[in-house]
């Protein structure tokens, strides 16, 4: 992957961690974010306009929450702006992708492959066109779920229960 360009659609906390990993692989990282962070700039992330992101990315990662402006943003019009053979990774929100358009692009070879941890309807429907698309890997919204991540959640839960039982509840939202 060295020398390739990783494009981030969204560069908040998760996007910054993704950028660090991409840079460790020798990739150049560009991003589109309506609110570019200084932390990302300090890491060397180059912020670009949306059309530049689509045109320059060898790998495009979706890393932002679902909003009106990005619902269906991965569609045939924007896929046409992308490099032939682009790789698309979505572990953000399934509704950001027009699934039939992505399936068509995968089957034609315009998109080389896609790694999707989310789809528009979960659990995935049997008639989802991505299930029959070439070079498409779909996981059940579990990309965060490494063994160490699950262990941290269990440890935090135990500590929160202990604190509650000791009369010192943590992370109270209705004080």
Regions found by a protein language model. Give the residues of each.
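Residue-level preference for short coil/turn positions at secondary-structure junctions
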Residues: 1-2, 55-56, 84, 132, ...
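Glycine-rich NAD(P)-binding loop of Rossmann-like domains
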Residues: 1-17, 44-46
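Gly/Ala-rich phosphate-binding loop of Rossmann-like dinucleotide-binding domains
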Residues: 19, 23, 106-107
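Short alpha-helical functional segments enriched in proximate histidine and acidic residues
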Residues: 21, 56, 160-164
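Residues at the starts of beta-strands that form the adenosine-phosphate
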Residues: 27-28
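Conserved SAM-binding motif I beta-strand of class I
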Residues: 31
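Rossmann-like adenosine-cofactor binding region
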Residues: 34-129
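C-terminal helix-to-coil terminal segments
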Residues: 120-175
């Amino acid at each position: 992957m060295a020398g390739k360009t990783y494009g981030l659609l969204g560069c908040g906390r998760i996007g910054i961690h993704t950028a660090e990993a991409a840079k460790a692989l020798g990739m150049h990282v560009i991003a589109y974010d309506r609110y570019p962070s200084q932390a990302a700039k300090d890491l060397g992330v180059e912020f670009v306009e949306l059309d530049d992101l689509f045109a320059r990315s060898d790998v495009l990662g979706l890393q932002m929450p679902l909003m009106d402006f990005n619902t269906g943003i991965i569609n045939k019009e924007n896929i046409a702006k992308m490099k032939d053979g682009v790789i698309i990774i979505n572990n953000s929100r399934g509704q950001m992708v027009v699934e039939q358009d992505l399936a068509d692009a995968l089957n034609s070879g315009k998109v080389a492959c896609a790694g999707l941890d989310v789809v528009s309807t979960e659990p995935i429907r049997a008639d989802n066109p991505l299930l029959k698309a070439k070079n498409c890997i779909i996981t059940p919204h579990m990309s965060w779920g490494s063994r160490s991540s699950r262990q941290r959640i269990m440890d935090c839960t135990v500590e929160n229960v202990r604190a509650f039982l000791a009369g010192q509840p943590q992370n109270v939202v209705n004080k």
